[in-house]
Design a protein with these regions (language model features):
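Short alpha-helical segments enriched in small residues
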Residues: 1-157
Length: 157
């Protein structure tokens, strides 16, 4: 069973819903969830927020934070996760933001520097990844790590 299938199974078992907010993964997280038969029982939907304006308007990410630090930081990942969870009224959410490569971004973040976040009603956990593969492999690894984070967070009391 792959990471997405395991995550969907855990969500079903716990009767929880999921929403996603994606930047660097560009919808891959949502695609992997919806590849799982029966995922409609738990997956509400997602926001692909590549542009700062979308992060601000749809997810409630602080504009000043984006201007000062750029989108590749723990605080933005956390705000994305909390924002999509609230906006879609989900029990739990996942968010991804970072630089998948191949070049650096406007704030010169390293290629492979990606932040993933998982928000529940009671907390939001952010994890930094430092990946070193191709763009596609970095995006896939970020998704796998996000699903693993979700599983860990749902095991916590």
């Amino acid at each position: 069973m792959n990471e997405a299938a395991r995550a969907v199974a855990v969500l079903k078992e716990k009767r929880l819903t999921l929403a996603t907010a994606e930047s660097c993964t560009g919808g891959l997280l949502g695609k992997l969830v919806t590849d799982v038969p029966g995922s409609s029982a738990v997956y509400l939907g997602g926001v692909i927020s590549y542009a700062y304006a979308v992060k601000e308007r749809l997810l409630g990410v602080d504009a000043a934070l984006l201007q000062e630090q750029g989108a590749v930081c723990a605080a933005v990942a956390g705000q994305m996760a909390r924002g999509v969870r609230a906006r879609l009224q989900a029990d739990v959410s996942l968010a991804t933001t970072g630089n998948a490569g191949p070049g650096t971004d406007e704030k010169n973040h390293k290629v492979g520097e990606i932040f993933i976040a998982c928000a529940t009603k009671s907390r939001c956990t952010v994890q930094k990844l430092e990946l070193s593969s191709s763009r596609g492999e970095n995006r896939a690894a970020a998704c796998a790590a996000a699903f693993a984070l979700l599983e860990r967070e749902l095991e916590e009391p």
